[in-house]
Amino acid sequence: MKQADELRFNEDGLIPAIVQDAASKEVLTLAYMNKESYEKTLETKETWFYSRSRQALWHKGETSGNTQAVKGIRYDCDQDALLVLVEPSGPACHTGSYSCFTKEQTEEQAADRFGIMNELERVIAERQAEMPEGAYTTYLFREGVDKILKKVGEEASEVIIAAKNRDHEELKWEAADLLYHLLVLLREQSLPLDDVLDVLKKRHSEIEE
C-alpha cells in the first residue's frame, strides 16, 4: 500500500475514499481521509476518516461497534482517490442500513438471468450487517457456522433424493434452497461468490485449450 506522501490530497488536504465490501462488492459509503486518518487506517487495519463537518478524525465503529476491517486499499490512476476494501462488522450507514447507497436495479440487470445470484449475495451481506429480527438469514448467522453447515448438508441430501425420484418440481425448489444456503456459508466465510466463479472460468478455459 502507498504511503500518504505518495498520494495526491486536494487543496483541503483530503482524498475521497470509496468503501466497498470486499466479499459482496457492494459500495458501502463515500468518505474522506486526510494524511493522519490514512496513516491510522494503515496502522490499525480499520477505517479512519476525516469529518468535514466536525473538522476532526473519526474511527468508523468507535461508538457503534460497527468497525470495518481493511482487506486492501487501491488507488486510481491519478492517485487522488481511494478504493478501500473492507470486511464490515455491522451496518455502514448511520441510519442502520448495510450501505449508505440505495440499490436500484436497471433493466440490463433485470435481464441478466444470473443477476439474482449477485442480488441474493448482496441481500445476505445486508442481513449479516443489520441482523433484522425475524429474518431467517439473521437466525442462521446468530446460530453460527455449525448450523449453516448442517443446513447445507440437509439441502444437499434433499437435492439428491429429489433427483433420485425424478421429481423435477421438487428438485428445482431444493436446488434453490441449496444455492441460498451455500451463499450464506460463503458470506460467513468471507469468501466472495466471484472467487468461486473465477474457479469455474479457469476450469472452463483449461478445457477449451
From Swiss-Prot:
Origin superkingdom: Bacteria
Spans annotated as Phosphoribosyl-ATP pyrophosphohydrolase: 117-209
GO BP term, pick one: L-histidine biosynthetic process
GO molecular function: ATP binding; phosphoribosyl-AMP cyclohydrolase activity; phosphoribosyl-ATP diphosphatase activity
Keyword Amino-acid biosynthesis recorded: yes
Region feature Phosphoribosyl-AMP cyclohydrolase, mapped onto this chain: 1-116
Primary residence: cytoplasm
Keyword Transferase: no
Enzyme's top EC category: hydrolase
Keywords in alphabetical order: Amino-acid biosynthesis, ATP-binding, Cytoplasm, Histidine biosynthesis, Hydrolase, Multifunctional enzyme, Nucleotide-binding
One GO location term (cellular component): cytoplasm
Catalytic activity, reaction form: 1-(5-phospho-beta-D-ribosyl)-ATP + H2O = 1-(5-phospho-beta-D-ribosyl)-5'-AMP + diphosphate + H(+); 1-(5-phospho-beta-D-ribosyl)-5'-AMP + H2O = 1-(5-phospho-beta-D-ribosyl)-5-[(5-phospho-beta-D-ribosylamino)methylideneamino]imidazole-4-carboxamide
Pathway: Amino-acid biosynthesis; L-histidine biosynthesis; L-histidine from 5-phospho-alpha-D-ribose 1-diphosphate: step 2/9; Amino-acid biosynthesis; L-histidine biosynthesis; L-histidine from 5-phospho-alpha-D-ribose 1-diphosphate: step 3/9
Entries under Pfam families matching the protein: PRA-CH (PF01502), PRA-PH (PF01503)
EC numbers, comma separated: 3.5.4.19, 3.6.1.31
Intracellular or extracellular location(s): Cytoplasm
Family: In the N-terminal section; belongs to the PRA-CH family.
NCBIfam families to which the protein is assigned, alphabetical: histidine_hisI, PRK00051.1, PRK02759.1
HAMAP family per record: HisE, HisI, HisIE
Name the record gives this protein: Histidine biosynthesis bifunctional protein HisIE
Source organism per UniProt: Bacillus subtilis (strain 168)
Gene: hisI
